[in-house]
């Protein structure tokens, strides 16, 4: 991948401490990892007292290691009856442990702890290990205690990933290996990156008191002081963010300011229902408005859709976004299922077949070169694909062990059910435009000008109509017709799991097979056509040679038409919308603007342009919007968030002098 992850090696010393052979240093003191975490990092940052005054509290750690600092902090949060509503723990790790090594290391440390905690920590170890993500570069968000404790893991070199984070930190745990063993993690560049993320009242703590670290802290705007170290160590450092000069051009993100936590979501498809669930989980009261009589009636009403990540040899933006979206969606869906909100999905994997032998070689070489873990994707020879699919195939491909198919409508229903009584629905009503009143609240108006609903926040998630309703001129999207075909039982090879390539085939209940889909830009015909069925049959024949397209009467087949919303750069539009009117007034000053310089339509967000990847992108997009609204750490790198920022087209227009 961008920089493949090299896992840590688990080694125990005779005294029971965990040691890194790579750095030649221990992960924790022989006097006890949990006691060290409590003394140095929790107490060193004035916790738990400080988080009692915040709705949400964010901690950044440099070096996740065995996870003991997180486990100790989580246990302290659980034990505090006055704890903050939501605890965010963000940790950067260049060499994460594999799942079972992490479980062994943390369990060993807990078993030999020298302190007694109110909250048992051993069960937390299992929860952490069970949720542990695939070792792929980037951001991985895990949730515990019904989402009230969030662990955001960032796998990669801190020098590279810290400047790419978007969050506001209240406390820093500086916990790399000793400066003499891993100087990069204590360099001035690290502290300058942390300073750009610090809240005005942020604190830090670290076990070291080296002169180089003190100088780097001072240069970055942190005031430090020495205090007694842990287990007889003479000194450690604690302190506050207290810059004597301006150290950053842009302030870190803040929560949307409002006295009323209510929101409107327009569009009840995959995008909108995912946003509903994420906002409701944070205590927002949401009004969902859908122009049809029921949710998931348009493209999200297809019998099934496939979900899998993209893999590209250059690990481009689209591939990274799809990987992040895929892994995040799996995490969210499992959480829904654990909460009793079931929906229909296959869990036996998905196969992507090459269209030629040369393409198969490129596919195989890609996952080898990128170091893709087998739990994400593995190469599948032609013979292996034949055996797995129980039918002939022309070429090998990839097996996505966690990919599959899903019923979008059942997922949307589960997300709405999870929102519970925080959700109100208005169906059969079409919104014509949005208007922000003098009180700062948004109103959703119908064609007659009547107010259908009002709220502090609005999220437009109604595909190709979103830009029109939000009044956007610089959000180029296109409607693309897609026709799928339903094949009767016994008329197609009975593959046991979804297959994609040039088209797709999905086994449904009762022996019915779904195949498709056509791709017809700017075609608005919602009626299935014989020509579309014929195209799908021919595509299926190329995918599975045992099938004959001529064996069926295309004119007698059933099917369905949906419309994708596709942006001109094929990436979705997710996040706070730009204020185009304000940008026009300031156009002369914004010709060289970056996305963070663009004026925003306060309280107005978008989640649209997902194309054919709504299942992969909707959950991550919803989490990003909820995080932006509540001022939480973003669930993906800033570079990726900017790639899908709805205002990116406005910035391009400003640079070319096309905004007036």
UniProtKB/Swiss-Prot annotation:
Region listing for FAD-dependent cmnm(5)s(2)U34 oxidoreductase, in residue ranges: 266-660
GO terms for MF: flavin adenine dinucleotide binding; oxidoreductase activity, acting on the CH-NH group of donors; tRNA (5-methylaminomethyl-2-thiouridylate)(34)-methyltransferase activity
SUPFAM superfamilies: FAD-linked reductases, C-terminal domain, FAD/NAD(P)-binding domain
Catalytic reactions of this protein: 5-aminomethyl-2-thiouridine(34) in tRNA + S-adenosyl-L-methionine = 5-methylaminomethyl-2-thiouridine(34) in tRNA + S-adenosyl-L-homocysteine + H(+)
Keywords: Cytoplasm, FAD, Flavoprotein, Methyltransferase, Multifunctional enzyme, Oxidoreductase, S-adenosyl-L-methionine, Transferase, tRNA processing
UniProt KW Oxidoreductase keyword: yes
Pfam (any one): DAO
Region named tRNA (mnm(5)s(2)U34)-methyltransferase: 1-242
Subcellular location: Cytoplasm
InterPro entries to which the protein is assigned, alphabetical: FAD-dep_OxRdtase (IPR006076), FAD/NAD-bd_sf (IPR036188), MnmC-like_methylTransf (IPR008471), SAM-dependent_MTases_sf (IPR029063), tRNA_MAMT_biosynth_bifunc_MnmC (IPR023032), tRNA_MNMC2 (IPR047785), tRNA_S-uridine_synth_MnmC_C (IPR017610)
Cellular component, GO annotation: cytoplasm
Keyword DNA-binding attached: no
Chief place of localization: cytoplasm
Gene3D superfamilies from the UniProt entry: D-Amino Acid Oxidase, subunit A, domain 2, FAD/NAD(P)-binding domain, Vaccinia Virus protein VP39
EC number: 2.1.1.61, 1.5.-.-
Swiss-Prot/TrEMBL GO biological process terms: methylation; tRNA wobble base modification
Signal sequence interval, chain numbering: none
Cofactor: FAD
NCBIfam families cross-referenced by the UniProt entry: MnmC_Cterm (TIGR03197), PRK01747.1-2 (NF002481), PRK01747.1-4 (NF002483), tRNA_MNMC2 (NF033855)
Protein function: Catalyzes the last two steps in the biosynthesis of 5-methylaminomethyl-2-thiouridine (mnm(5)s(2)U) at the wobble position (U34) in tRNA. Catalyzes the FAD-dependent demodification of cmnm(5)s(2)U34 to nm(5)s(2)U34, followed by the transfer of a methyl group from S-adenosyl-L-methionine to nm(5)s(2)U34, to form mnm(5)s(2)U34.
Homology family: In the N-terminal section; belongs to the methyltransferase superfamily. tRNA (mnm(5)s(2)U34)-methyltransferase family.
Protein name: tRNA 5-methylaminomethyl-2-thiouridine biosynthesis bifunctional protein MnmC
Protein's organism: Burkholderia mallei (strain ATCC 23344)
Gene (UniProt): mnmC
